[in-house]
């Protein structure tokens, strides 16, 4: 709970510094960057101070600062693929943006604003994925594969329900959300924004599946396969964007994200099933049935 309070404080401080540095100080983009860095630094100091004062079990002792080769190897084996995965995902976003840019400033503005709303309604999926990582890691670590599978099934059930709710909210609140970003008449932008949103919300279930399966595998210590899922996502988005630009179709451009989500979801689902089956075979080999 305390870390959430620090996060809320950091967000509020970020807004306050934005107003002070951009509006009051006239610093523009530099002020926005400085506000973000300062607010995150304050949050990090508060979290570190809380750990040091209130949770001594998490505070490294005098002999615990020396890195151990095995620990470093394990952390890098998971951390590097995760970093590459985020880089690949960001590259896919650049591909999508390049395709949208060809349709003019109205399309770009509408796509950007609708994308903000899309990101907002996706937050529940992201949170569920983070919870699945911890859940799967704990149960996979103690060899309870049945609980891992039950958790994944429950996570996918929640994902389907949430995806439907997010789709309804995304389409219902699109115009009010657009009004927050733009003053005056937004009628010219709405067709672009609504086309993008109406296509994306149909594929929220594959998007939610990505967060479930990717985080489960990462929680179980598998870093390469989630990264490979990011590559599948990038390739699907790239192929769709190329065809969209050649055909000059904004509708096809809006399918870049859904195509990427679907490709990644299928790849990650298949990878998860293979990992679970392999783990079950290894467990049966280690624990042969008792003889009667």
What are these regions (language model features)?
Residues 2-3, 110-175, 207-229:
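Small-residue-rich hydrophobic transmembrane alpha-helices
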Residues 20-27, 87-120, 138, 176-185, ...:
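Helix-terminus/linker motif at the lipid-water interface of multi-pass membrane proteins
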Residues 24-80, 136-203, 244-292:
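Short alpha-helical transmembrane segments in multi-pass integral membrane proteins
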Residues 11, 15, 19, 32, ...:
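Hydrophobic positions within alpha-helical transmembrane segments of bacterial inner-membrane proteins
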Residues 1-26, 30-33, 38:
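Hydrophobic transmembrane helix module of multi-pass membrane transport proteins
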Residues 8, 12, 34-41, 83, ...:
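Residue-level signature of the transmembrane alpha-helical core
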Residues 1-8, 46-49, 64-95, 99-100, ...:
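Hydrophobic faces of transmembrane alpha-helices in multi-pass small-molecule transporters and flippases
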Residues 12-23, 48, 94-98, 120-123, ...:
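Alpha-helical transmembrane segments of multipass membrane proteins
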